[in-house]
Structure formats: structure tokens, C-alpha cells
Swiss-Prot record:
Reaction(s) this enzyme catalyzes, per UniProt: a ganglioside GM3 (d18:1(4E)) + UDP-N-acetyl-alpha-D-galactosamine = a ganglioside GM2 (d18:1(4E)) + UDP + H(+); a ganglioside GM3 + UDP-N-acetyl-alpha-D-galactosamine = a ganglioside GM2 + UDP + H(+); a ganglioside GD3 + UDP-N-acetyl-alpha-D-galactosamine = a ganglioside GD2 + UDP + H(+); a ganglioside GD3 (d18:1(4E)) + UDP-N-acetyl-alpha-D-galactosamine = a ganglioside GD2 (d18:1(4E)) + UDP + H(+)
UniProt cross-references to Pfam families, sorted A to Z: Glycos_transf_2
Function (record text): Involved in the biosynthesis of gangliosides GM2, GD2, GT2 and GA2 from GM3, GD3, GT3 and GA3, respectively.
GO cellular component, as recorded: Golgi apparatus; Golgi membrane; membrane
Family statement: Belongs to the glycosyltransferase 2 family.
Listed name of the protein: Beta-1,4 N-acetylgalactosaminyltransferase 1
Species for this entry: Homo sapiens (Human)
This protein's encoding gene: B4GALNT1
Record localization: Golgi apparatus membrane
Keyword Cell inner membrane: no
Family annotation (Gene3D superfamilies): Spore Coat Polysaccharide Biosynthesis Protein SpsA, Chain A
Pathway: Sphingolipid metabolism
Subunit note: Homodimer; disulfide-linked.
Length: 533
């Protein structure tokens, strides 16, 4: 019997080695298959045109330059495209790049109309979101004018003293003169200096003339700017000039950011934070009431007084109640992101912890650790890790970037695994762009980004794409929540609810919800395609 088992094991091992040998030989010699890929890199685009920014000024055209291709390749070329790694037999641990052409969600005539409408909406967006403060200003060389480079700000229809104005001219001139010109406001002075002549007080153009340089500079210290056009967030590019020299700087016009502060609550004895006063746990459920109740039970073992908010769009909702539990019902199948919006809208604490309804809290689900990260860093959101029944835990750290495309075509979204850098002072934590579906976030920032309710069945990373550039994201691998097992044992009874859930939660690649998502990304984010690792 023992020899028979040993012979069987040897046979299995021999077959496995032979299979691996054949696989290696086929991938090594077959002309139609590729070698394992190198670490992920953006797909190669067609030959790039010359960058206009590298063209010399006419007076320097005769000077030879050796272009550094490695550096030039890092610059934006505004002609991105998306390509899969393609071909080959996928091998374990081999990095593959998957590309999605979002334009394939449209027929040709519809694509032309959608592209034209999208471009029109994009130009309207630029006109709303950009201001003169975004314009490039280049300071002139060796100017005698002293002026503020940045940091001058005024509220709409209010006045300020303009700091830092001065003329550093050579002494001995008969007369000194400077001019100030504005477009959205007017100039005046808070006091008049003897020996200085003013022209244009209370107007958009102000001239100051004096035979004495010191008197002129003292007068410049008293110059005021008044906003005359009610715009809540813009900038006035003003001109400051003297004979033979002119400079420009911006005065930002806006209301100061209004804070939204939350009381931290009294600290329990020996505790660093009052988690019940700082954190609300939010989840979205659909049909899986057994899993939801298991989640709540596990939460109560460690956080008995933390509020749990539930958004529910089940067909036949069951009552879920208890201390510190809020259960909100929605129309049947309203959707994944719509449920997130509803749950987050009811949060009254500084932070919201998002969890799936089939998670299970353990001793390693330490919310204090996540709160500490947000309290002591500028991050807006920090994710943890989700542990599967196999013991494997994932943080799903994702890097997102958008590359500019050719005019009218849209941009390219790049998604790959990884992080930007470690978070100083917090071992096991990093800074990234997207995390797993278990995260603690500042409630106001989550509401600011929001969850697009048009994404009803399959969505997650789209939230981080909406927040790219405004949402500061981190991830800590040492805060872990368990994921309830999805394994179905063959001897268990058929679960109609689980089958219904699976139909809604896991649509096929050709399902209409997937096509609708591609059309949404094409228009909403002005994308033509996307690649993922």
C-alpha cells in the first residue's frame, strides 16, 4: 500500500515536470507566442511628432542641440493610445496589459455625434473651471519693478492693500512714474504722500508720478485694489509698468474656504480616540441578509456603540434593527453607487468607514489605526486589507493616470498596481490612487467626490477616478477585515437568493451594463480608451 502511494506520487510529479517542460519549450520556440513580458510600461504609441516647445526662438535657431530621447519620452505628446500586451500564452505571474476601446460602445454615426457633443461640453467645462490664475506668466529679466508673485487674494466686491509694490530704479532721475492696470477691479490709495501725483484713483488705471523715489515707494505701500465684478472664484491679471518695463501678476478673487468641523467627542478612559464619535460604518446590501447580520454581529464585538448605516435596494426587504443601526430602503435594484450615496448622506461623523455587507470584523480590524492616519496626515482616505478564506489579503493598491490624446479624440486612462511612496511615520502604509473596498475617509471629501448613480451594478475604481487630483489616498496593510467565504459546498441546498444576487452583481462582458459604463466613461471623463494591468 505504501509503495503504491509512493509510485502514484512519483507519477504525478513526473507528469507535472513534463507538462512544465513542454510549456517552456512551446513558449520558447513557437513563433506565434511571446516571451514573458517585462514590467509594465505604457503602450508604445505611433511615432511621435516634434514637440513645438522644443523649437528654438529664431535668434537661437543656429545653435545645435543634442536631444535626449530618454527625457523627451517622458514629456506629454497629446497623442495617446491603448494597446493590450496581446498574443502569447498567459503564464503565472506574467504581467498582462488589458486594453478597452471605449469608442466600441458606439456605432460610427453615434460616435461622431457623441464626440461632437462631448467636445462642446468640454469647452464649456474649461470656461467654468479655468481662471486667469491658471495662465502662464513669465517674469521679465532684470526688471526694476518689485511686485508679489503669488498669494494676493481678495473677496468678491471687497478691498485689500496690495503688498510688495516697489520701484528699484537708479537714483538721479528727474521724475519717477509707475502705472497699474486692472480688468476686474479698481485702484486707489489708503493715504496720500506729499510730493506724489495720482491720476485715476477709483478707476482701472492708476498712474503715480513723483520726483522723489522714496516718496513714490512709500505711496506704493498704500495702494489698494477693490474687486468690482462679483465672481466667486476667479483672478485678475493686473499690469505693473514703468518706462521700458512691464510686469504682470494675479490677484485671486474668491471667498475663503469655509471650514466644516466635527467635535471629537469625549475620550473614553485610556483611549486615544473616541471611535463612536468619530466614525460611522456604512454599507450597501442587496438580498444577503445573513451576511449583513453576521457583519453587524462582528462589529458589535469590537465597537458596540458605533453607528452602522445600511442602504438596501432588495426586492423584498427584511427588517434590520438594533441599537445604533440605521436601515434605509431604496427602490428595487436602484444600484450600487446610488446606495453608497444614500448611506454616506446620512453620516453625521467626521469619518465614514465603507465596508461590503459580507465582511467580518476581527481583532485585526483596528479602526483606531486608520483614524490615527487621517488625524495626523493630510490624507482624505485610507484603505485597509481584505482577507479571503484562503488567508490571502489584498489591499488592491492602484495607480491611476490620464494621458492627453490628440484633439477631439479624448484621453487615455492608465491603471496599474502599485503605490507612489511610503507614508512617513506609518510603517505598512503607502500613498496611492485607489484602494480596496474597505476604507476610512473624511465624510465631506467622500460627499464632494460622490458616487455616480449611473453606475448601478459593477463599479468601484470609478469613484477614485472621479476623485483623481482632489482625493488624497493612502493604504495600510496591517488593518485587516475578513471576507466571508463565497465557496458553495456541493451538499448544501440551492440558494435562489444567491443566484439572483450573482445575476445582478456579476454581469457578463457583453452585458448592457458594461456597455453603458464604457459609454459613460467615454463622455463623462473625455476618454477614448483605458488600459489595466
Amino acid at each position: 500500500m505504501w509503495l503504491g502511494r509512493r509510485a502514484l506520487c512519483a507519477l504525478v510529479l513526473l507528469l507535472a515536470c513534463a507538462s512544465l517542460g513542454l510549456l517552456y519549450a512551446s513558449t520558447r520556440d513557437a513563433p506565434g507566442l511571446r516571451l514573458p513580458l517585462a514590467p509594465w510600461a505604457p503602450p508604445q504609441s505611433p511615432r511621435r511628432p516634434e514637440l513645438p516647445d522644443l523649437a528654438p526662438e529664431p535668434r537661437y535657431a543656429h545653435i545645435p542641440v543634442r536631444i535626449k530621447e530618454q527625457v523627451v519620452g517622458l514629456l506629454a505628446w497629446n497623442n495617446c493610445s491603448c494597446e493590450s500586451s496581446g498574443g502569447g500564452l498567459p503564464l503565472p505571474f506574467q504581467k498582462q496589459v488589458r486594453a478597452i476601446d471605449l469608442t466600441k460602445a458606439f456605432d460610427p454615426a453615434e460616435l461622431r455625434a457623441a464626440s461632437a457633443t462631448r467636445e462642446q461640453e468640454f469647452q464649456a467645462f474649461l470656461s467654468r473651471s479655468q481662471s486667469p490664475a491658471d495662465q502662464l506668466l513669465i517674469a521679465p529679466a532684470n526688471s526694476p519693478l518689485q511686485y508679489p508673485l503669488q498669494g494676493v487674494e481678495v473677496q468678491p466686491l471687497r478691498s485689500i492693500l496690495v503688498p510688495g509694490l516697489s520701484l528699484q530704479a537708479a537714483s538721479g532721475q528727474e521724475v519717477y512714474q509707475v502705472n497699474l492696470t486692472a480688468s476686474l477691479g479698481t485702484w486707489d490709495v489708503a493715504g496720500e504722500v506729499t510730493g506724489v501725483t495720482l491720476t485715476g484713483e477709483g478707476q482701472a488705471d492708476l498712474t503715480l508720478v513723483s520726483p522723489g523715489l522714496d516718496q513714490l515707494n512709500r505711496q506704493l505701500q498704500l495702494v489698494t485694489y477693490s474687486s468690482r465684478s462679483y465672481q466667486t472664484n476667479t483672478a485678475d491679471t493686473v499690469r505693473f509698468s514703468t518706462e521700458g518695463h512691464e510686469a504682470a501678476f494675479t490677484i485671486r478673487i474668491r471667498h475663503p474656504p469655509n471650514p466644516r468641523l466635527y467635535p471629537p467627542g469625549s475620550l473614553p478612559q485610556g483611549a486615544q480616540y473616541n471611535i463612536s464619535a468619530l466614525v460611522t460604518i456604512a454599507t450597501k446590501t442587496f438580498l444577503r441578509y445573513d451576511r449583513l447580520r453576521a457583519l453587524i454581529t462582528s462589529i458589535r464585538r469590537f465597537y458596540p456603540t458605533v453607528t452602522v448605516v445600511i442602504a438596501d435596494d432588495s426586492d423584498k426587504p427584511e427588517r434590520v434593527s438594533g441599537p445604533y443601526v440605521e436601515h434605509y430602503l431604496m427602490p428595487f435594484g436602484k444600484g450600487w453607487f446610488a446606495g453608497r450615496n444614500l448611506a454616506v448622506s446620512q453620516v453625521t461623523t467626521k469619518y465614514v468607514l465603507w465596508v461590503d455587507d459580507d465582511f467580518v470584523f476581527t481583532a485585526r480590524t483596528r479602526l483606531e489605526r486608520l483614524v490615527d492616519v487621517l488625524e495626523r496626515t493630510p490624507l482624505d482616505l485610507v484603505g485597509g486589507a481584505v482577507r479571503e478564506i484562503s488567508g490571502f489579503a489584498t489591499t488592491y493598491r492602484q495607480l491611476l493616470s490620464v494621458e492627453p490624446g490628440a484633439p477631439g479624440l479624448g484621453n487615455c486612462l492608465r491603471q496599474r498596481r502599485g503605490f507612489h511612496h511610503e507614508l512617513v511615520g506609518f510603517p505598512g502604509c503607502v500613498v496611492t490612487d485607489g484602494v480596496v473596498n474597505f476604507f476610512l475617509a473624511r465624510t465631506d471629501k467622500v460627499r464632494e467626490v460622490g458616487f455616480d448613480p449611473r453606475l448601478s451594478r459593477v463599479a468601484h475604481l470609478e469613484f477614485f477616478l472621479d476623485g483623481l487630483g482632489s482625493l488624497r489616498v493612502g493604504s495600510c496593510s496591517d488593518v485587516v477585515v475578513d471576507h466571508a467565504s463565497k465557496l458553495k459546498l456541493p451538499w448544501t441546498s440551492r440558494d435562489a437568493g444567491a443566484e439572483t444576487y450573482a445575476r445582478y452583481r456579476y454581469p457578463g462582458s457583453l452585458d448592457e451594463s458594461q456597455m453603458a459604463k464604457h459609454r459613460l466613461l467615454f463622455f463623462k471623463h473625455r476618454l477614448q480608451c483605458m488600459t489595466s494591468q
